[in-house]
Design a protein with these regions (language model features):
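Flexible "cap/lid" loop of the alpha/beta hydrolase fold
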Residues: 4-13, 79-99
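Short beta-strand immediately N-terminal to the catalytic nucleophile in serine-hydrolase-like folds
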Residues: 49-51, 76, 103
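Gly/Ala-rich beta-loop-alpha elbow adjacent to hydrolase catalytic centers
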Residues: 50-55, 59
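Active-site signature of alpha/beta-hydrolase-fold catalytic machinery across serine-
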Residues: 61-65
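A conserved short beta-strand
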Residues: 68-81
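C-terminal catalytic histidine-bearing segment of alpha/beta-hydrolase fold enzymes
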Residues: 101, 114-161
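Short beta-strand/loop motif that positions the catalytic acidic residue
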Residues: 101-104, 108
Length: 161
């Protein structure tokens, strides 16, 4: 696997550093998207966020910081390298109703799968509805992931009625 490309060299790991403006701008962009969807008539419980790699980490960070819950968050090949204390210190309790699907390749050499496993344990201990699926690929999304994502979306939307 190659190291790939990031649209920003600043990651969520840099959140508390002087270069955190990229992370902050990303959070504002996601928030603006949610607000725009609401203005168009979507309810928050019908809005889902999906992120891959760096986007997965940003989507998880966005979820825990919100004063509301969304329909769900799908994080593919990205997770926190943080300890539970860091997450709980930054957690908004209102966000805990957002279901989370974590997916990660067990052969990922770019973002270690242990980060998704760590994220799963943290979110589970904090009371989130969280699922973790590991698959035998590297830093990519296998075709079989489509069915898992589809089932997650269907299950969450069925829970809304």
């Amino acid at each position: 696997e190659s190291s790939g490309y990031s649209w920003s060299q600043n990651s969520i790991r840099d959140y508390h550093s002087p270069i955190n403006n990229y992370v902050g701008k990303s959070m504002i962009t996601i928030s603006n998207c949610v607000n725009d969807l609401e203005k168009r008539g979507f309810k928050k419980k019908n809005i889902f966020i999906l992120g891959f790699s760096q986007g997965a980490i940003f989507s998880l960070w966005f979820i825990i910081k919100q004063k509301y819950s969304l329909g769900g968050c799908i994080s593919i090949a990205g997770g926190f390298d943080k300890k539970v204390e860091f997450i709980s210190e930054n957690l908004s309790l209102e966000s805990k109703q957002t279901p989370i699907l974590l997916m990660h390749g067990e052969k990922d050499k770019i973002i270690p799968p242990k980060e998704s496993k760590n994220t799963y344990d943290i979110f589970l201990n904090l009371g989130f509805n969280v699922e973790l699926f590991l698959y035998s690929t590297g830093h990519k999304i296998p075709l079989k992931a489509k069915k898992i994502i589809w089932n997650f979306l269907i299950n969450q939307t069925n829970n809304l009625t």
